[in-house]
Amino acid sequence: MVFLSGNASDSSNCTQPPAPVNIPKAILLGVILGVLILFGVPGNILVILSVACHRHLHSVTHYYIVNLAVADLLLTSTVLPFSAIFEILGYWAFGRVFCNIWAAVDVLCCTASIMSLCIISIDRYIGVSYPLRYPTIVTQRRGLRALLCLWALSLVISIGPLFGWRQPAPQDETICQINEDPSYVLFSALGSFYVPLAIILVMYCRVYVVAKRESRGLTSGLKTDKSDSEQVTLRIHRKNAPLGGSGVASSKNKTHFSVRLLKFSREKKAAKTLGIVVGCFVLCWLPFFLVMPIGSFFPDFKPSETVFKIVFWLGYLNSCINPIIYPCSSQEFKKAFQNVLKIQCLRRKQSSKHALGYTLHPPSQAVEGQHKDMVRIPVGSRETFYKISKTDGVCEWKFFSSMPRGSARITVPKDQSACTTARVRSKSFLQVCCCVGPSTPNPGENHQVPTIKIHTISLSENGEEV
């Protein structure tokens, strides 16, 4: 939000000559604010590129995170530089018209950033509460509508002062005031902060309650399963095994339970990461939105200029630290950031044009730093994919659930050794995959997605060896 010089409310109607610049103070402020801006601009660009360059991050949740990064990028690139110049010089040097436009863009970006966190909290609540139904509830079309409404509301809140909803501006154009009209301050504080904050807190309280309940239920379900449920095992059998009626029902129940546990674990992890983001948001913005209404409605209790500057820049700090939070709390983003910085995502995009699918590397047959007998599963157009996070990166596998009958063909050797096993050790769990298919496709083979069945998925967060 836009800052008001401490003597602006007492300013005269004539233009005052600007005071001389304090050089040591200007250098110190320039270094501090410059570092802040240099963290914010590249950091938010890195978030956007990380999602754009990695297909496994192309989800509605990550689109919301990109929207948050876009709002923060606009703030750090178009608003903060002029705020820094204003602080260093001690007066506004860009004229009255640009002051009004700059103030409106400031409110627009800050409001959009805060409302993005609000939408993300709602998304996480749905993801944790309904992990299996989440893809049908949160679709890309609904996500796009939510983002359009977000920017429309932010625009409505920000343009009021441009149409006269403000106190009279001083004639001195070296002063750029914050809008202290009490009615607008109340409207903007409620719309930009307090209503979104209430929604965020309610959603994350619900997420906490649901996560505790689901964790308790899923843990008790694991204890009643087989004794080897302390590992995470995924077996994709080469063909559907014949089962009796009770065996089929038991297999379906176990598969449903295990898939729910896998999806719930992922949603819970994402909620933790975004919970840290929201916690930092409250710490950064709450002081400003406490000080601003108090100064507007109770001028006698208006804080000093130094206090206002601190809480003012503390709010701006929130838009600069979000890109730091992601890699520190999410292995997924950490690896994506590293790939972007190493320009690996561009190479992956070029190589993916010639690839038929994704590859699983069996470590039991791998030499140090090399992989042999790769198992390749061709990519289809109607698949549902899950992500496996490893300590050294992100591995993807695909579960094809909606392919029509007869559309997939694969040659299955009779030799049992053709079923290759791949192990992936993770920070929180171990995955063992038994996948169907030859190492290299046959020339005359139809490269469609093979019809596969998940026989057993059992989970644990201990990550013990099989």
Curated annotation (Swiss-Prot):
Q: Name one Pfam family in it.
A: 7tm_1
Q: Which residues lie on this side of the membrane: Extracellular?
A: 1-25, 90-99, 169-181, 298-304
Location(s), subcellular:
Nucleus membrane; Cell membrane; Cytoplasm; Membrane, Caveola
Q: What kind of membrane protein is this, topologically?
A: Multi-pass membrane protein
Glycan-linked positions = N7, N13
Chain ranges for the short sequence motif Nuclear localization signal as given in the UniProt record:
334-349
Transmembrane parts of this sequence: 26-51, 64-89, 100-122, 144-168, 182-205, 273-297, 305-329
What PROSITE patterns does the record tag this protein with? G_PROTEIN_RECEP_F1_1, G_PROTEIN_RECEP_F1_2
According to the UniProt record, one GO cellular component term is: plasma membrane
Q: Which residues lie on this side of the membrane: Cytoplasmic?
A: 52-63, 123-143, 206-272, 330-466
Q: Per its UniProt record, what Gene3D superfamilies does this chain match?
A: Rhodopsin 7-helix transmembrane proteins
- Any Gene Ontology biological process: positive regulation of MAPK cascade
Main subcellular location of this protein, as a coarse class: nucleus
S-palmitoyl cysteine lipid sites: C345
Biological role stated in the UniProt entry: This alpha-adrenergic receptor mediates its action by association with G proteins that activate a phosphatidylinositol-calcium second messenger system. Its effect is mediated by G(q) and G(11) proteins. Nuclear ADRA1A-ADRA1B heterooligomers regulate phenylephrine (PE)-stimulated ERK signaling in cardiac myocytes.
PANTHER family (alphabetical): ADRENERGIC RECEPTOR-RELATED G-PROTEIN COUPLED RECEPTOR (PTHR24248), ALPHA-1A ADRENERGIC RECEPTOR (PTHR24248:SF16)
Q: How does it assemble?
A: Homo- and heterooligomer. Heterooligomerizes with ADRA1B homooligomers in cardiac myocytes. Interacts with CAVIN4.
Similarity-based family: Belongs to the G-protein coupled receptor 1 family. Adrenergic receptor subfamily. ADRA1A sub-subfamily.
The molecule here is called Alpha-1A adrenergic receptor
Q: Which organism is it from?
A: Cavia porcellus (Guinea pig)
Which gene holds the coding sequence for this protein? Answer: ADRA1A
